[in-house]
Structure formats: C-alpha cells, structure tokens
Regions:
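An N-terminal assembly and electron-transfer interface module characteristic of large anaerobic redox
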Residues: 1-135
Length: 135
C-alpha cells in the first residue's frame, strides 16, 4: 500500500473530506493534517504547524501532494488577502527541500489555484475592499 501525504487547499469538505473518502475507497494510506490546523475561511491556517506536521509524516511516504496556497499562505482565501513579504514565502517554500532531505525518494506534487477576478462586489471570499470597489 502506498502512503500519500496530502495537504489540502483548505478545510472545506470538497478539499478535506472528499480526498479522504477517495483514499479509503482506493486502499491508499492517505495522511492529512488535522482539520483544526487548516484555518477557517478568511482565518489562515497555522502554516508553521502544518509544515511541522508534514515533516513528521513523510517518513515512508511515496508521494507528497501539496497545495501551495496552503503551505505558503494558509489557504485559498488567505492567499488572496495576504500581505506577506516575499522573504516569508520564499522561506516557507524552502521547506520542500527539507522534506526531500528527510525522505529523498518521495515524489512531490504541488498545485496552486489561479486567482480570479469575480464579477460581483461582495467581500465574502475576497479582500474587504471588494464590498465597495468590486468589479
């Protein structure tokens, strides 16, 4: 049985629960961080805790499938709202090299969403200023 470490995009069921279901149906050992680490809507995940959790899970794993939005910014919505300096993001990205040192044979697959410009003026998933200055 292959062990896959999966870092989801965020805590929503389509990104957290469904992959777990698919893993179980497929007979894969799918390891995901506790949901509590992943933030909640506009509240970003505890990125450092997710990285530490990931480092502790990769031993013996064949693959790491990782949302770059999660591991760089703390989730999809926080990736749209962040004001992080480039140096912080670069430091977080360097953790992938550390993963490779911990488990040299692991295959790492990263994915990232492309930010969209919604055709509405709500601030629900967007920066608060969209309420007043949205599309």
């Amino acid at each position: 049985m292959s062990k896959i470490v999966f870092i989801p995009l965020d805590e929503r069921p389509c990104n957290y629960i469904y992959p777990d279901y698919i893993g179980r149906m497929s007979g894969l050992e799918l390891s995901m961080p506790p949901k509590e680490m992943l933030g909640d809507f506009k509240k970003e995940a505890d990125v450092e805790a997710v990285w530490e959790w990931t480092k502790g899970q990769v031993k013996g794993a064949s693959h790491l499938v990782v949302s770059m939005d999660m591991l760089l910014y703390g989730g999809i919505v926080p990736s749209r709202l962040h004001h992080l300096p480039e140096a912080v993001c670069a430091k977080r990205l360097e953790c992938l090299k550390e993963i490779k040192k911990l488990e040299p044979g692991i295959q790492i697959y990263g994915f990232q969403l492309i930010t969209r410009a919604p055709a509405r003026d709500g601030s629900g998933e967007e920066p608060d200023y969209y309420e007043d200055y949205g599309y």
